[in-house]
């Protein structure tokens, strides 16, 4: 007879969702301030496509890197999530210190995309460690958090129309750091977390 499913603390799913929302808010951070960059950096309207493509390219490369090296299997997924969140937030804020040229923006966006591979997919892995039963519903909830997270920069820009674009960047980086800290301090490894070919309950 298989052991009963342990109860999942009520905070787990909302905390993972909040952490995912904070981390994925960096995805379209630059798009939300595109008009500001055109004005202050003398960039053209075509830069939004290049910036978005840089994020996607970074995510693809990052996903391959994390997968091929099995980063989330070799190390604690929570630690991977925290470090990835911190590095993505740093890449986002780095644009404030770099020369005001398109290369600076695309390079930092590529970095964000790369480290998002340690946020969104790894967050899903952390959730799967808690929800052997009802995993589909939990993952659906997290997909909703992803959608809200990617829309957050635009909502933030709409609410803070008088804010300098630099403040928008800093707020989004702060949210990403907060998401990483939430995951690290409030979400322990789940009983079904698969690591090294076996779940925690099998070891």
Located regions from the model:
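Juxtamembrane intracellular "pre-TM" segments in multi-pass secondary transporters
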Residues: 2-6, 189-203
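Extracytoplasmic
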Residues: 11-45, 63-66
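Conserved MFS/SLC helix-loop-helix module at the cytosolic interface between two early adjacent transmembrane helices
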Residues: 63-102
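Cytoplasmic helix-loop-helix junction between adjacent transmembrane helices
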Residues: 108-145
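Residue-level signature of mid-helix packing/kink "hotspots" within the transmembrane helices
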Residues: 28, 55-64, 150-151
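Helix-loop-helix hairpin linking two adjacent transmembrane segments in secondary transporters
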Residues: 133, 141-192
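Juxtamembrane helix-start elements in MFS-like secondary transporters
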Residues: 43-52, 101, 139
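Hydrophobic core of transmembrane alpha-helices in multi-pass small-molecule transporters
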Residues: 21, 91, 102-118
